[in-house]
A protein has these predicted regions:
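Phosphate-binding site of ATP-dependent enzymes
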Residues: 184, 210-265, 318-331
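N-terminal-proximal low-complexity accessory segments that begin disordered
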Residues: 2-51
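Glycine-rich phosphate-binding loop of ATP-grasp-fold ATP-dependent ligases
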Residues: 154, 185-211, 237, 261-277
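A long amphipathic alpha-helix within ATP-dependent nucleotide-binding catalytic cores
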Residues: 221, 250-253, 262-327, 363-366, ...
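Extended active-site and interfacial segments that coordinate phosphate-rich ligands
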Residues: 39, 250-275, 337-339, 346-356
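ATP-grasp fold ATP-binding core
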Residues: 154, 178-201, 222-232, 315, ...
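C-terminal active-site "lid" helix and adjoining low-complexity regulatory extension at the edge
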Residues: 325-328, 336-394
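Conserved N-proximal alpha/beta basic substrate-recognition cap immediately N-terminal to
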Residues: 37-47, 51, 59-176, 193
Length: 394
């Protein structure tokens, strides 16, 4: 079931990955997206047909090379030139941020259409900050007994460079002293970032050039997270929906791959919900999984009690190696937005034949050629910067 049920007002679906970093810039400032993110927005927007239906439209932003923004129908096809638009469109953003709202308000495609935007509330901004992941992890540590050594150290920028440097040195030493994690490095995360962006390892022992760069990053962003560098073995996510009444409901499991660096999304395992559940409960007990889901739902409902946010929420997990044991990190990050795991869920429902399994792939470069095992999800040229496809098990 879609978290955005079909309504009387047609919807405008907008794919705006990278919105987390945009949140760190005030609405008065012009935020410049990286070229890579602009190509992602331009080329991957048709994937939102997995969510759209009926009279819905999809907004495909302009490319970095000047290809203008365009509108697609719910099947992902270009609207004919001069096509009349609905008088109103209810905007459904991949992730909320003021900069995409301004882009849409100023877009000439919508001169004769009223766009209805979701509100961006203080509680939404609070939970979009990586500090929220710390707060949820602390709650799970207290309620369910997960190890406190997983908790990051959040360091706010000091009054000057020297003060910031002292704070960072102390935090790094504190993380190093823990029995958990790789002793040759720690992990640094910027406050508004996700899906591998704004995350980088810091080698130890600490070198002055690396410390100087870290001080600069902390000063620019206002804070950074420092946490143990763990050997990630398996990546999962718990996907939730939040209704207009504020109820948080479990939606689906997501089992995904990352690039060899371990910090960037590569693709999702496509199989039945029952099979995903069986796979995950082979690694932790069903009782522990249900307790985790219930605890996360409780925390999310409380933290979003004054929010008007409706839609998807993804909480990333991973299994890491601790000596001879495989252990669960129950909250790596919170994604208060639609996720690739949600798209993969609907790709499985809509494209994978009964009884088959596969992988949802998102890759740089042109698409794989269609075959009995490859199902392209985008119509792209040989010059495409990104491709998305399903690879069925043979």
């Amino acid at each position: 079931m879609n978290a955005y049920p079909t309504a009387s007002t047609p919807r405008l679906w907008v794919f705006n990955p990278g919105h987390e970093e945009a949140l760190s810039f005030s609405r008065e400032k012009r935020y410049t997206l990286s070229k890579e993110i602009r190509w992602m927005r331009h080329e991957l927007s048709p994937l939102l047909r997995l969510l759209a239906s009926g009279e819905d439209l999809i907004y495909a932003p302009a490319s970095p090379e000047g290809i203008p923004a365009r509108l697609l129908n719910a099947e992902g096809d270009d609207l004919p030139a001069g096509c009349d638009l609905p008088a109103e469109l209810s905007v459904v953003l991949w992730g909320l941020d003021d900069h995409i709202v301004r882009e849409l308000r100023e877009c000439p495609l919508f001169l004769s259409t009223t766009l209805l935007f979701p509100p961006i509330t203080p509680s939404y901004l609070r939970l979009s900050h990586r500090r929220a992941s710390y707060d949820l992890l602390a709650y799970l540590t207290d309620q369910l007994g997960y190890p406190s050594d997983l908790l990051p150290r959040w360091i706010e920028a000091g009054v000057d460079k020297s003060d910031t440097e002292l704070r960072l040195r102390a935090a790094i030493e504190g993380i190093k002293s823990r029995p958990l994690g790789d002793p040759t490095r720690v992990l640094i995360k910027r406050p508004y970032s996700s899906s591998g962006r704004g995350v980088f390892p810091l080698p130890l022992p600490l070198q002055e050039k690396h410390l100087e760069a870290l001080v600069g990053s902390c000063t620019r962003s206002g804070s950074v997270s420092i946490e143990p560098y763990l050997e990630v073995i398996d990546n999962w996510a718990l996907e939730y929906t939040r209704s207009e009444s504020g109820e948080i409901s479990f939606f689906a499991l997501s089992h995904f791959d990352t690039l060899p660096s371990g910090r960037a999304y590569l693709g999702n395992i496509l199989t039945s919900p029952e099979d995903l559940w069986e796979r995950l409960t082979s690694l932790i007990s069903e009782e522990a999984l249900l307790a985790l889901i219930n605890a996360q739902c409780t925390w999310l409902e409380e933290e979003l009690s004054d929010s008007q946010y409706t839609g998807y929420i993804g909480i990333d997990l991973f299994f890491y190696r601790d000596g001879e044991h495989l252990r669960l990190h129950p909250c790596v990050e919170i994604n208060l937005r639609t996720t690739m795991g949600v798209l993969a869920h609907f790709a499985y429902e809509q494209y994978v034949p009964d009884g088959r399994k596969g992988v949802f792939r998102l890759e740089r470069g042109p698409r794989q050629q269609p075959s009995q095992s490859i199902i392209p999800l985008l119509l792209t040229s040989s010059e495409a910067h990104f491709s998305a496809y399903i690879e069925l098990e043979k």
